[in-house]
A protein has these predicted regions:
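P-loop NTPase Walker
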Residues: 1-35, 39, 183-297, 320, ...
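Extended, charged low-complexity regulatory segments
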Residues: 1-197, 201, 205-206, 693
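Domain-scale macromolecular recognition modules
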Residues: 85, 91-93, 100-103, 470, ...
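A structural signal for short, well-ordered beta-strand segments and their strand-loop junctions
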Residues: 92-94, 158, 217, 252, ...
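Hydrophobic side chains in beta-strands
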Residues: 93-95, 161, 346, 575, ...
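Conserved phosphate/pyrophosphate-binding and hydrolysis machinery centered on Walker-type P-loop NTPases
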Residues: 186, 190, 330, 334, ...
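Alpha-helical nucleic-acid-binding subdomain
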Residues: 238-481, 488-496, 504, 512
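Conserved helicase motor core of SF1/SF2 NTP-dependent helicases
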Residues: 248, 257-265, 269-273, 278-285, ...
Length: 697
């Protein structure tokens, strides 16, 4: 009887492990050698500090830096080998190149591994590895650096290796076998997002390996894996263009620090350095540092249409809501539209002529007339107004130097700049921003929180005008920007971002998961801002069971959504007589969770305030984590949070409290409830007192 696939592959795995073990010993020796050489050089420099001439000292410093770099590389190789030992590869393809006699076996893993210059494992991003994701057994091809390679794929296998042990080895003719995908999707969620290289689907692979240099916009339904795909795309681009793109050249803009922590493992897990990540608020702080303050973005229960308390009494709303500031909602809606950007663009086009009134400049016998100064100012039309003044000041000095026959003292640039600044009719961006609202006849739509504090809705419009008047801090190092949760940002925020980051972008999100009741922009508005961008849709949802996604589909129909047919429990509805009983039932559900196999439970409430109140009650009996706007870490276990903070996260099990018709009743509430329910992977329960929301009837 012939050897089974599992026996054959287990034997091969033992051979690979043996070679990894040898490589590990060599790597450990390299690390120790580098440490010894570094310490020896350092000791020599200290002991002979007074005796070494400057040239030798310089050579020793160079040697020290080189030894340090070598040691860092050795440590990196060692860490990579440790990861490979646990799970060296996840697939095998046998490919016979046209004109060649025998097929070659390619084992595919997270990292490449060579032994005696022979490849043992190929990086999942290598050109040949793409056939695993794209091709079935039969005629196949891949794009190599030297051209397209044709041939035949004679074998495809998939493996699960964990802790160095082969759990399964399956023969397959197609891409990812359904049972493999089902096994991976049915696992409990780990503490943070993990790589998906063993289950990347064909349509996902096309996005990941897309090498176009422009902007890509990904519209993906809940659970489609869009964030993970975007991160894998970055890892692929870092591999493919390693000579001109490194991790320090990539920035991720995410909704909050918790989400940034949640996704932080993916890129390092794929063998790359961590990526710089920041939020829109942090970016605004960098740009406005020392100039203006701003209010943080309002909680949902502080926004006009978002929430009246669960009692149904609008007067019980917390915070600075519509009852205390009825104009806030109108201001936010006006500034969230594409038309608002068009108004700003029209104003910016007129701004230089409105704000600069050139006059004659004299210094002793030297004179630069107003007409000449005006021409020089217009010549620098692509620059912000105040930067143009610097350039005109340089031109005046150059002209003075040329015409200075009598060799008079050269005027100081600061003095020239002061004279030019006096020709401005408005002195700072705040004055310009006020003038914009006066010019469009909407003076009442600009209200400051206090003398030096902007409302959040004004921050990015202010920065957009600041870019035209004084100039923004541009990121010269960022060559690729990733923007997640694209539907939560307004057109003017994108317009300002384009000034700060004039680079390639990957923009992703789901316009079916709106979180802001006062934002009026659409996917079409975003596509208008990025004309020529490559646009892709992801309609297949992998996160939740078929039953959960079917349930969520009754709350809000997602156009084109295709749930993977992974079956589980029907979502539970728990009716309670009052809120006291509801709290008891939630505690019972927590006890059930703790006695089961699931690793993470998300208790998702409508607002931060509701989440904080329930957390205070639950924390007396259970170990729970409160995820709030100030949080910086995501932890497994039991988390209590708001819909806004839960966006992008996933949990094995989800409880949605207060799912009553008092709490979830507006169209915006419908979207919030949909988001909360689609965070669940395996089990979903909604609790309510009184009458349940009509969205789940």
């Amino acid at each position: 009887m012939g050897e089974s696939v599992l026996e054959e592959e287990s034997r091969h795995l033992r051979q690979v492990h043996q070679r990894i073990g040898q490589a590990l010993e060599q790597a450990k020796e390299s690390v120790q050698k580098s440490d010894r050489e570094y310490m020896d050089t350092k000791r020599y420099m200290v002991e002979h500090r007074g005796d070494i001439d400057p040239h030798e000292m310089f050579q020793n410093e160079l040697l020290l830096k080189q030894t340090d770099r070598t040691g860092a590389m050795a440590v990196e190789i060692l860490e990579r080998l440790k990861k490979l030992k646990d799970s060296p590869y996840f697939a095998r393809i046998d490919f016979c190149e046209a004109g060649q006699g025998e097929p070659f076996s390619y084992y595919i893993g997270r990292f490449a591994l060579n032994h005696d210059r022979e490849p043992l494992v190929f990086d999942w991003r290598a050109p040949v590895s793409g056939m695993f994701y794209d091709c079935e057994v039969g005629p196949a091809a891949f794009q190599a650096p030297d051209g397209r390679i044709q041939g035949e794929l004679t074998k495809k296998r998939q493996f699960k290796i964990r802790g160095g042990k082969m759990e399964y080895a399956l023969e397959t003719s197609s891409h990812i076998q359904d049972d493999v995908l089902q096994k991976e999707l049915s696992h409990t969620s780990d503490e943070k997002m993990k790589s998906i290289i063993s289950t990347i689907q064909k349509e996902q692979n096309r996005i990941i390996r897309n090498e176009n240099q422009g902007t890509m916009i990904i519209q993906g339904v809940a659970g489609s894996g869009k964030t993970s795909i975007a991160l894998h795309r970055i890892a692929y681009l870092l591999y493919r263009f390693k000579n001109r793109l490194s991790a320090k050249n990539v920035t991720i803009l995410s909704p909050n620090r918790v989400f940034g922590d949640y996704i932080s493992n993916v890129i390092p897990e794929l063998g790359e350095e961590p990526i710089y990540e920041l939020s829109f608020e942090e970016l605004a702080e960098i740009q406005l540092e020392g100039r203006m303050g701003f209010e943080p973005e309002q909680d949902l229960d502080q926004e006009g249409d978002a929430d009246e308390s669960r009692s149904g009494d609008p007067g019980e709303s917390r915070g600075k809501s519509r009852s205390s500031d009825p104009g806030r909602g109108e201001r936010e809606r006006f500034k969230s539209t594409l038309e608002f950007v068009r108004l700003m663009d029209a104003y910016i086009e007129m701004l230089p002529d409105m704000v600069f009134a050139p006059k004659d400049y004299t210094f002793g016998r030297f004179r630069a007339d107003a007409k000449w100064i005006g021409k020089r100012f217009k010549a620098y039309g692509t620059f912000p107004v105040k930067r143009r003044l610097l350039m005109v000041a340089d031109d005046i000095r150059d002209r003075f130097d040329t015409e200075n026959i009598m060799e008079d003292e050269l005027p100081r640039q600061g003095g020239i700049l002061k004279s030019l600044a006096s020709m401005l009719t408005m002195k700072n961006t705040l004055a310009v921003y006020r003038d914009f609202y006066e010019k469009i006849g909407k003076k009442e739509l600009f209200v400051m929180a206090d003398k030096k504090t902007l409302e959040w809705a004004d921050v990015y419009p202010f920065l957009y005008l600041h870019a035209a008047f004084e100039g923004l801090k541009e990121s010269g190092i960022t060559r690729h920007l990733v923007i997640d949760e694209m539907q939560d940002y307004t057109p003017v925020q994108y317009a300002a971002l384009n000034r700060m980051f004039p680079c390639q972008k990957t923009i992703l999100g789901d316009f079916g998961q709106f979180i802001h009741p006062n934002h009026l922009h659409t996917l079409e508005d975003l596509l208008h801002l990025y004309e020529g961008a490559e646009f892709v849709r992801l309609n297949k949802s992998y996160r939740s069971t078929y039953e959960i996604m079917t349930f969520a589909g009754h709350i809000r129909a997602a156009s084109g959504l295709e749930p993977v047919k992974r079956h589980g429990d029907v979502p539970g509805l728990v009716s309670c007589r009052n809120e006291e009983e509801e709290l008891c039932r939630i505690m019972d559900l927590i006890r059930d969770f703790r006695s089961g196999d699931n690793a993470s439970l998300g208790i998702i409430l409508k607002t931060h305030r509701e989440a904080a109140e329930l957390y205070d009650l639950l924390s007396e009996e259970f170990e729970v984590h409160l995820i709030e706007p100030e949080s910086t870490r995501f932890s497994s276990g039991i988390s209590v949070t708001s819909v806004k903070m839960a966006k992008g996260l996933e949990f094995d099990q989800v409880i949605v409290p207060h799912a009553s018709d008092r709490n979830y009743r507006t169209d915006h509430d419908r979207s919030l409830l949909y988001i909360a329910c689609t965070r669940a992977m395996h089990r979903l329960t909604l609790t309510f007192s009184g009458k349940r929301t009509g969205f789940i009837d």
